[in-house]
């Protein structure tokens, strides 16, 4: 096990995080195509150099640098105003499961550095890293898909937290949220999986890919653990 502060990485987590480094920077505001003069640019350069120089022979060292520079890039973007003003919403639903989808509703969940207590993924190949501790989705997006005829509902696609009344186009990598007692930072979009095909007409699960606009689920890193209850406030950029 590899640790960075409170975050624990398995060997597979290290490998997959390093393999995702460029994509994680691409997903940040101004990340693709990369803005050479943007707030994140100097941090990306250091992370990519560490990846090139140490990724194969000293992955622990590469991970430490990549993690630090990635988090610093998000901080720099926040300082530059990339994530906008505070917005207030609510926790509409909570979900956890023993693996796979759908997840099952809960009135309250306890969240640690590694995610929701009692929740697990059927496979960790594409899930379960510290920056994928929580999966969030918008009740308004779900409702729009349902209104279009897709048999989708909260928790069916595997999100832990369904929020309402937040501007989902601003819930992007690097944005921070206070959800109940938990503070988290959006890390990436959750790519659609064919296991979710049953929730979409003709199996067209790709419609929730972020390439189609602000419709994707998102992953988040836990910054402050705690309890979340249905009906709790969900605040985007709470310090703005």
Model regions: which residues?
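Electropositive, beta-rich accessory/interaction domains or terminal extensions
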Residues: 2-16, 21, 26-48, 61-179, ...
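Amphipathic alpha-helical coiled-coil segments
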Residues: 53-55
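Short, basic/aromatic beta-hairpin or loop at an interaction surface
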Residues: 150-160, 201-216
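Short amphipathic alpha-helical patches
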Residues: 168-169, 210, 231
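Short, charged, solvent-exposed linker or helix-capping segments at domain edges/interfaces
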Residues: 197-198, 232
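Well-ordered alpha/beta subsegment
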Residues: 217-240
């Amino acid at each position: 096990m590899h640790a960075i502060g409170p975050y624990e990485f398995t060997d597979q987590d290290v490998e997959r995080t390093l393999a995702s480094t460029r994509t994680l920077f691409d997903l940040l505001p101004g990340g693709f195509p990369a803005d050479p003069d943007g707030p994140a640019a100097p941090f990306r350069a250091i992370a990519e150099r560490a990846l090139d120089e140490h990724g194969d022979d000293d992955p622990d060292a590469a991970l430490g640098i990549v993690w630090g520079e990635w988090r610093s890039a998000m901080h720099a973007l926040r300082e530059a105003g990339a994530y906008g003003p505070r917005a207030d919403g609510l926790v509409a639903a909570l979900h956890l499961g023993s693996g796979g989808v759908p997840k099952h509703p809960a009135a309250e969940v306890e969240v640690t550095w590694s995610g929701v207590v009692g929740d697990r993924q059927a496979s960790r190949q594409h899930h379960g890293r510290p920056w994928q501790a929580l999966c969030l989705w918008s009740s308004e997006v779900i409702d729009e898909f349902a209104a279009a005829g897709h048999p989708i509902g909260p928790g069916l696609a595997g999100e832990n937290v369904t929020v309402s009344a937040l501007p989902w186009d601003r819930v992007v990598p690097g944005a921070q949220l206070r959800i109940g007692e938990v503070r988290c930072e959006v890390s990436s979009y959750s790519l659609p999986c064919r296991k979710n095909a049953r929730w979409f007409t003709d199996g067209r699960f790709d419609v929730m890919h972020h390439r189609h606009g602000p419709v994707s689920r998102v992953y988040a890193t836990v910054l402050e653990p705690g309890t979340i209850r249905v009906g709790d406030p969900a605040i985007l950029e709470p310090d703005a």
